[in-house]
A protein has these predicted regions:
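Aromatic/basic-lined ligand-recognition segments
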Residues: 1
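Conserved AdoMet/S-adenosylmethionine-binding subsite of the radical SAM
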Residues: 6-156
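Short glycine/proline- and charge-enriched loop/turn segments
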Residues: 156-165
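Short, flexible active-site recognition loops that position polar ligands and cofactors
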Residues: 164-174
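A cross-taxonomic marker for long C-terminal extensions/tails that follow the last structured domain
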Residues: 172-194
Length: 194
């Protein structure tokens, strides 16, 4: 994989970009495999970003932390019961890992996939802000990601039922009000999208 990634080195250098590992939960893969990729990219001075939901043992983060430039870290629902209802697991491990990564000095982009019927409300946004402040977490950016159903057409092709038909993105004005909540709380690097 690293040899394949190196073929695009010219694009990384010209754009100032790098490699983002995402899709599924990258951190759930073999730590040795991720570490091998991360070390090789670091050696070649190519930036590495990891997209994660944070639901893995912290020792996996600890192993790759020296080789990762940025973490795109999903924070979906602050209420543990709602998180379990919609995501299937409690959010304690996810939030604990976020605190540990922040304490370790990691560069973090908080990403909040925002669904009107689930977490697209003032209470969840205020709870998120409170958590960040309480733990001294200062993300490089906060991205509020409006819900979309772009991948819904793939489900029937895979013989699966798409269950997100009753879900919607908050209205533009609501999204803008959430951005303002974060900005007013000192997170001036908050934006819609990312």
């Amino acid at each position: 994989l690293v040899k394949e990634l190196m073929k695009d080195r010219m694009f990384y250098e010209q754009s100032g970009g790098g490699v983002t590992l995402s899709g599924g939960e990258v951190m759930a893969m073999s730590t040795d495999y991720i570490l091998q990729i991360a070390k090789a990219l670091k050696k070649e001075e190519i930036s590495l970003t990891i997209d994660t939901c944070g639901y893995v043992s912290y020792d996996k983060f600890e192993a790759i932390l020296p080789y990762v430039d940025t973490f795109l870290y999903d924070v979906k629902v602050m209420d543990p019961e709602l998180h379990k209802k919609y995501i299937g697991v409690d959010n304690k491990l996810i939030l604990d890992n976020l605190v540990k990564l922040s304490d370790a000095g990691a560069r973090i982009y908080i990403r909040i996939p925002t669904i009107k019927e689930v977490n697209g409300n003032v209470q969840n946004m205020e709870d998120t802000i409170h958590f960040l402040k309480k733990h001294g977490i200062h993300p490089a950016q906060v991205n509020l990601l409006p819900y979309h159903n772009t991948g819904s057409s793939k489900y029937p092709k895979l013989g699966m039922e798409y269950k997100g038909t009753d879900l919607h993105a908050p209205e533009k004005e609501e999204m803008e009000s959430f951005v303002k909540l974060f900005q007013d709380a000192g997170y001036t690097n908050t934006k819609i999208g990312g």
